[in-house]
């Protein structure tokens, strides 16, 4: 059989029409089954980063017509889709990276490590992996980054919902363990209410000490993520890094 040239593409793919386009093309090319990977909790100054991987069965696509980027869905819609996804998926895995580990290795490295762990934890090995936004080296299968992936590929959208629902539930639990911060409402993001609580109560164990606003409350100098984490990320071979963007993550 003659080898196909130019497929799979080596560059970052942008959003294509329809939530099944990318998976269908890969499966037609003999590169299935296709797993999607996405995260929830990159931006908040408190709580974990949650990363999910999801390998959808072909029959699942018709049953999951409501799939979309989790951020575009209501909380009720996400909760309704969550058990459907876990029931219809060929395999799925959720990884929780706590605040202390984010502080130790940086948010971008934590994101990449979480994606590696999630894919490695799938009980069925994917033929191909679609990641949301940037390249992830060291995966157990060939992969392709997709800009806007959670709105472009059904498997990434499914992973997005698994990650978001899991993290939201964790933040509700943390609200009862650390009362006064309002974690159940804002989920650890820098809302005015959270900022006021942080100033009033000081950081708890779930606040990320590497975030500028948390460090300022502790009287510590802000870190420069570009300097602190870039060497580690580049050493991992990440060409399309978000380190520079993360330099302003708590601004």
Swiss-Prot record:
The keyword Cytoplasm applies. Its EC number is 3.1.26.4. It is an enzyme of class 3 (hydrolase). A divalent metal cation binds at residues 38-39, 132. InterPro entries: RNase_HII, RNase_HII/HIII, RNase_HII/HIII_dom, RNaseH-like_sf, RNaseH_sf. GO terms for biological process: DNA replication, removal of RNA primer; mismatch repair. GO terms for molecular function: manganese ion binding; RNA binding; RNA-DNA hybrid ribonuclease activity. Manganese or magnesium. Binds 1 divalent metal ion per monomer in the absence of substrate. May bind a second metal ion after substrate binding. It is found in: Cytoplasm. Residues 32-223 form the RNase H type-2 domain. SUPFAM superfamilies: Ribonuclease H-like (SSF53098). One of its GO terms (cellular component) is ribonuclease H2 complex. It catalyses: Endonucleolytic cleavage to 5'-phosphomonoester. Its cofactor is Mn(2+); Mg(2+). Keywords: Cytoplasm, Endonuclease, Hydrolase, Manganese, Metal-binding, Nuclease. Endonuclease that specifically degrades the RNA of RNA-DNA hybrids. Belongs to the RNase HII family. HAMAP family: RNase_HII_B. This is Ribonuclease HII. The lineage of its organism: Bacteria, Bacillati, Actinomycetota, Actinomycetes, Mycobacteriales.
